[in-house]
Amino acid sequence: MAAPSAPTAEDWAFAGSYTNKNSKGYRYNWGQQVRSMMGTVVEGPDQGYVRFRIEIAPDGTLAKLETIWTTSAVAEQLARKAVENMPPLPPTPTGKPLIFEKTISFTPFASDGPPSYKDDCLPDPPVFRNPFAWDGKSPQVRSEPPKAEKLDPQAMEDCLRQLPRDSIEAEMARDRREMERWGWNK
């Protein structure tokens, strides 16, 4: 399978200004840029995945690249070479270091599509805590689940202003991920 195309200048301009969800657009474009520079992949022993922990300095330069795991030494080598030869990136959207993990797929089938941004302005749901958990010593007290925080109207308006229009490709990728996750396609 041929390598996907690299993000365009327009894609990077959007990614350089999108601050929601830990700079989701920047992280996606970074992965696309790396994969596009890795070249064509054919089915065989060299295909695989590699997961990195990445730190990008506020000016867009790579500060740290650490391999978390890999299924192919060739895929890791190609990904590292691509990272070393990346063109200059725009500054991070927040003006702070951007730290994230990314899995690069060097396989003959597409496994990563564009992200969907439509729910990015909704507050994150509260973390589930078992209300019946008990340490066996203290008195048993049922804890109330935390309430979801509401975004103030001004923050919601600012967030909605940043959202791009969702593309058909993003919706198809989201649907494909859901199908693979829940086994709808079997």
Where are these regions (language model features)?
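A sequence-level signature for low-complexity, intrinsically disordered linkers and tails enriched
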Residues: 1-6
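Acidic/histidine-rich, surface-exposed loop or edge segments in extracytoplasmic proteins
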Residues: 7-20, 61-64
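Short proline/glycine- and basic residue-enriched helix-capping loop/turn segments at helix->loop/beta transitions
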Residues: 20-52, 80-118, 122
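Short tight loops/turns at secondary-structure junctions
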Residues: 45-71, 83
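N-terminal targeting leaders
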Residues: 70, 74, 119, 123-128
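Terminal low-complexity, intrinsically disordered regions
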Residues: 126-186
